[in-house]
Amino acid sequence: NGTIDAQTVRAQAKRIQDADVVVCQGEIPPDGIAEAARGAKRFVFNLAPVIDVDPEVIRLADPLVVNEHEAALAATVLGSTTPHLGDDSDAALRELLNLGCRSVVITLGSAGCVVGGPEGFDAVAAATVKAVDTVGAGDAFVGALAAELARGRSLIEGCRFATAVATLTVAKPGAQASYPSVGEVENIRQGEQA
């Protein structure tokens, strides 16, 4: 990830422009993130870890995906002076939207996530499972969300699917080895709707 700079992204400009969704995260150099964001139809930005990135790049995200701590830091990068945003995910969500973010998802671990944007606001609860290993859960969430957005799903529906994926991921050891099948995700989602 550390080698994906602006030059590398420019070399793939056609692929980025043609992609339905482009995903970046904080382990990519800031100039590479900025170049990808500006060329993408839809830019999903997982600001993890939080890095020094141009505030306008954060505002291009649709959605910005962060945890509670990262949400507070992102709000500060965007100019917020509101204290204790890391303690109130709903307040952090609204603050990030007020600061110009297109849409925001704040992941809450075993509590699911909150999501807000032009489609509205929602709190997505996670099913209760015995957590065995949380490694890879955030990546699973972001990947599943991006895939659902690329399939044309709404942000809120994408978050419901991604929350189910992350929930199942923590129930097994390992990172990629713990990622569930679509069938497993649909089974847990049917249980939520019952």
Give residue ranges: language-model regions:
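Conserved beta-alpha-beta core of the PfkB/ribokinase-like small-molecule kinase fold
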Residues: 3-4, 8-9, 19-91, 111-113
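Intrinsic disorder/low-complexity segments enriched in polar/small residues
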Residues: 13, 18, 26, 193-194
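Conserved phosphate-binding/catalytic region of the ribokinase-like
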Residues: 51-52, 76-194
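Structured loop/turn residues at beta-strand edges in well-structured enzyme cores
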Residues: 14-17, 59, 99
